[in-house]
Design a protein with these regions (language model features):
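Catalytic-core region of carbohydrate-active enzymes that cleave or remodel glycosidic bonds
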Residues: 232, 328, 332-338, 360-442
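Extended acidic/polar, glycine-enriched regions
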Residues: 64, 71-133
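Aromatic- and carboxylate-lined catalytic core of secreted/periplasmic carbohydrate-active enzymes
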Residues: 32-37, 54-57, 396-399, 406-409, ...
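Active-site mouth of glycoside hydrolases
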Residues: 58-60, 122-365, 372-377, 384
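Bacterial N-terminal signal peptides that target proteins for export
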Residues: 2-10
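Sec-dependent N-terminal signal peptides
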Residues: 9-17
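Non-catalytic, glycine-rich low-complexity segments
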Residues: 25-69, 75-76, 116-121, 479-488
Length: 571
């Protein structure tokens, strides 16, 4: 990995010390007293640099924080709207920290601020990592499992695209009210929009190469602060939309790296292959790290969105680019955020495929997307989720469906959404449903309260489960009537089930359905829930004989969920 540069290329300046636990700012301490923050909360230093001769985005900054243990952590800084600069840092130890900040505004590096602060204990769960108990699971630093469930609400900063035109912070709260925990957001690379009227594209952080819009950046600040307040974790897609020559919506000509917009790249291929252009793109990674990397609620950085569908960019070009960018991020990130890349998946390739990226140690989350008329019917959708997760499982990584959806989802039942999120989770993956106004029938549907309720019920069901030791997908047990299918997450002595009724007669009441579980002899408690309303339907104790356990399901419509747990043997 390349060494971290001594001075970071980003903005800073002088004298205004602020310590904060997002989103509030702590009051200034009395003279001689050190400010305090909670462990894993944000500490922030703001200052001016009036004598600078460089553009704010070219100011070099290095902030060195020394922990109570003696560990030194180095971060950068950034310019803010209205002038001035800031450094953000998240302490991970309790006790007294010291810091020194140097900045170079054009006349050489000099110290612009120094000081200390105290860190008190907190119950914050910390950053999300790859789990230690299972290669396929994510977990908070405190060890609790994290199962991504939420939305690909890619331009949430544009209220006109949100349900009820909610501003982004309110939309984040709305997601949380429906039990979601993950939001995927695009940093747009197509920086001009043509509809409903021409103008700057919302979400374009880098309108010119190496120049970052502080007002747009502040919108991402607000999203992360709302995410921390409401328990949502954000995946930021760093280069999204803008690699298709001659197209309005994904215009390469509106990409700041394109020569058509004054950039250095004649073609998207130049962007992915030329080392000098990669070096320019690295500055965007470092800006995002310096501004947002402090946050434990930045779940992951997603390097690129659907390169196969945005310019038909081949895997032989974007996979090496992705590996390089992931290496740059990991080398610079003191917090260890996860890295992923939102490719379409092995079912849609251009030149080669993404298996080298799936197996790369620099790729932390194996992500793919799922759309298409082949999967409008819910049984086909559920089967494809199972197939794709199984196809991905052998790489030994957490699996995420970063987008799926169908604009024709029935608004009375939202059954496509329902079956998608339950079958994905019970196949062993995290899952994000796409939501947008109905522009494209193949994918776009708003996240109405009725649709959101399906996430709430699934989230509540998952919260009841015992996840330690981890639950893994099991072989599908035999089920009746013919065509009924059961998904199982389990471990020895404990199994969660989701049962989907047969395609024939789907939507009519199902009675006398069974699932045969191959479990050891003994006593078991079996509980069933209505997976649409969350109502508990039944609970009973059963005895398994040599042939296993036959579960007789309560009557249901379409699908039902249950838990089977072994009871202690009675002497």
């Amino acid at each position: 990995m390349p060494p971290r540069p001594f001075i970071r290329l980003v903005p800073l300046a002088l004298l205004a010390l602020v310590a904060c636990a997002v989103p509030r700012t702590l009051p200034a301490p009395s003279q001689g007293a050190l400010p305090e923050v909670e462990r894993l909360a944000r500490f922030e230093v703001g200052f001016e640099l009036p004598e600078r001769t460089r553009h704010p985005d070219d100011v070099s900054i290095e902030a060195r924080f020394t922990a109570p243990s003696g560990q030194v952590v180095t971060v950068g800084g950034f310019a803010v709207a209205g002038g001035g600069f800031r450094v953000r840092f998240t302490p991970r130890e309790t006790g007294e920290y010291r810091y020194v900040i140097q900045a170079d505004g054009g006349s050489g590096p000099r110290e612009v601020s120094s000081g200390g602060f105290r860190v008190r204990p907190s119950d914050r769960r910390g950053f999300v990592r790859r789990g230690t108990g299972s290669a396929h699971q994510l977990a908070w630093e405190d060890g609790g499992p994290f199962i991504p469930l939420g939305e690909n609400r890619f331009n949430v900063y544009d209220p006109t695209w949100n349900y009820n035109q909610l501003p982004a912070p309110e939309y984040v709260a709305y997601m949380a009210s429906h039990g979601m925990n993950t939001l995927r957001v695009f940093i747009f690379t197509d920086c001009e929009r043509e509809e409903p009227q021409p103008g700057p594209q919302p979400g374009c952080l880098e309108p010119q190469v190496g120049r970052f819009d502080p007002e747009v950046a502040a919108q991402y600040d607000a999203i992360l602060e709302a995410a921390e307040k409401h328990g949502i974790y954000v995946i930021l897609t760093l280069f999204a939309v803008g690699f298709t020559p001659g197209e309005t919506w994904k215009s390469w000509e509106d990409n700041p790296y394109s020569t058509a917009r004054g950039g250095p790249a004649e073609t998207p291929l130049d962007f992915f292959e030329r080392p000098d252009i990669r070096a320019l793109a690295e500055r965007k990674l470092r800006y995002v790290l310096d501004r947002y990397g402090y946050s434990p609620h930045l779940l992951a950085v997603d390097l690129l969105n659907e390169p196969e569908w945005d310019g038909n960019n081949g895997e032989e070009f974007w996979v090496p680019w992705g590996e390089h960018m992931a290496e740059v991020w990991h080398a610079a990130d003191p917090y260890g955020h996860l890295v992923t890349l939102g490719s379409v998946g092995l079912h849609w390739n251009e030149d080669g495929d993404e298996r080298p990226w799936y197996s790369s140690p620099r790729n932390d989350i194996l992500q793919w997307h799922l759309y298409g008329k082949e999967y409008y019917e819910v049984h086909a959708l559920a089967a494809e989720f199972s197939r794709k997760v199984a196809e991905s499982w052998g790489y030994g990584k957490p699996v995420l469906c970063g987008e799926f959806g169908y604009g024709g989802d029935d608004p009375q039942t939202y059954d496509h959404t329902h079956v998608g999120i339950w079958s994905a989770i019970f196949s062993g993956a995290g899952v994000l449903a796409h939501s947008a106004p109905p522009f494209t029938a193949d994918s776009d549907v708003m996240m109405t309260p009725g649709r959101g309720q399906h996430f709430r019920v699934l989230s509540d069901f998952l919260s009841r489960l015992s996840w330690s030791p981890p639950l893994h997908p099991q072989l599908a047990p035999l089920a009746t009537p013919e065509g009924t299918r059961a998904w199982v997450l389990g471990r020895s002595g404990y199994w969660a089930l989701w049962v989907l009724g047969a395609e024939t007669g789907y939507g009519s009441p199902v009675r006398d359905a069974t699932v045969r579980m191959g479990v050891p002899s003994g006593k078991y408690r079996v509980s069933w829930w209505n997976d649409v309303t969350g109502e508990q339907l039944a609970t009973e104790e059963l005895t398994a004989r040599q042939g296993g356990l036959v579960l007789r399901l309560p009557g249901f419509v379409r699908h039902v969920a249950g838990v089977v747990e072994a009871l202690p043997a009675v002497p």
